[in-house]
Every structure is written in structure tokens, then in C-alpha cells.
Amino acid sequence: CEDFDQIAKYVGSLNLKHSSPKGMNTDTVLLGSTFIVGGQIKGQPMELFLVYPQGNYIKPADSKPYLVIGEVKYGKPILDRVITPDVKLGDASRCALISMDSTLKSDLTVGPPIDFVVYKKDQFKIASQKCLNLNDKEFSSMTNEWSEGILKGLNSFPSIDWE
């Protein structure tokens, strides 16, 4: 493939080919998987695509440079508040993990492990890769601090006039 657009099309076509029996209407029956495909081809910008079971795909909006698979109602508000085109990679990484923690705490159908990969622009290798479980000390510490910070913030608000 010469660019990530072709890669996304290829992943979508493979998904259709291997997940739908011949003759089945793929517009009404979803048997495939959803993928996030991203990375960089040397000499080109970084790209990110969400590939749907039907084979079609989308790119993130410039103002919201992230994509989410699956249950979005719990962790996405955190991403919406923090992730911008200018956010630092470390902050984006912590935000992604806290977003995932919110989903884990709110939806029993979502669970570990969490596969977490960091790729840095123009490096052409994975900078960091972890498989996190709930007993991971760093992840547990981060999520505990987040919970404490939320409570501290809530307790710092002035009383409501009817209290």
C-alpha cells in the first residue's frame, strides 16, 4: 500500500471477506469486527482510521484527533475535555487510560486486559507497549489518584443555595 487510505480500504475488504458468508447482505447483518488502524508511512503524515464491519472507514476530525471503539458513553467525555491537536503525548496517554478506567467502572461488559501502545511521530517503531490488568500498580495508582481528585474537586465547590 502506498498510503494509509489504501491500508484502511484493505483492512475493510479483508474484514468483509472473512466475516460474511457469501451472498449475505452486509448492510443488515454485522458479523465483522471494528478496527482502529493507524501509524505512519515514511515520508507521510501520521494517519488514523476507524474501519467498520461493512468495510467503510472514517478519519478523526482535526479538532478531535482520536477515535473510540465500542462503548463510548462513559470514557468519551474525558477525552472530549482533554484531547486536542496540541495535547502532549504523555497527557494524552494518561487521559486515554483514565477514560478506559471510567468505562471499566461503569460497564460490566468491558474488562481487562487493556492493550496500550504508544507510537511517536517519525520514529517508525513502537515507543511503548503494555498489557494492563486491574492489578497493574501504575494503572491502579493513577486511577485511585483520579478518583481522589474528582472527590477533592467536588468538595471544593461552594454549597448550593438549597443545601
List each language-model region with its residue ranges:
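N-terminal nucleophile
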Residues: C1-E163
